[in-house]
Amino acid sequence: MKSYVAVFIGGAIGSLLRYAVNLLGGTAVFPWPTFIENTSGSLLLGLLTGFFAARAKKPLVQLCLGTGFCGGYTTMSAFSKETVLLLQSAAHIGVLYLMASLACGVCFAFLGIVIGKKVSGAAGKEKERYQS
């Protein structure tokens, strides 16, 4: 039951933050709020993944922040809908949005994992393991 509560709390906070970012509004041409939510959410999930990689497992914290907060904050459904609408109305913008979102999402997640490992000390432990 604690797991459900952790995901619920994180998801509620993440969804509220996503709503706040959406209030900033996007342009009629490019859906900046969703782009910002998904790329920053990828960075945050990467940070959490890297940070908890070498730390004692804290499943409730991980569920609250990873599954709950990041899951509530990021939005695959809005990304998909916006991509389809852009492809139908302005194909070149739709392709740009699709490629930029995927490339930035993956790069930010990778960067987050690297930074998270460095902050937690996991990077040094991995280096020692390979040098032994």
UniProtKB/Swiss-Prot annotation:
Primary location class: membrane
Membrane-crossing residue ranges in chain numbering: 5-25, 34-54, 59-79, 95-115
Annotated protein name in UniProt: Fluoride-specific ion channel FluC 2
Regulation: Na(+) is not transported, but it plays an essential structural role and its presence is essential for fluoride channel function.
Known catalytic reactions: fluoride(in) = fluoride(out)
Xref: PANTHER family: FLUORIDE EXPORT PROTEIN 1-RELATED, FLUORIDE-SPECIFIC ION CHANNEL FLUC 2
Keywords: Cell membrane, Ion channel, Ion transport, Membrane, Metal-binding, Sodium, Transmembrane, Transmembrane helix, Transport
Organism annotation: Bacillus licheniformis (strain ATCC 14580 / DSM 13 / JCM 2505 / CCUG 7422 / NBRC 12200 / NCIMB 9375 / NCTC 10341 / NRRL NRS-1264 / Gibson 46)
GO molecular function: fluoride channel activity; metal ion binding
GO cellular component term of the entry, any: plasma membrane
Binding site for Na(+): 71, 74
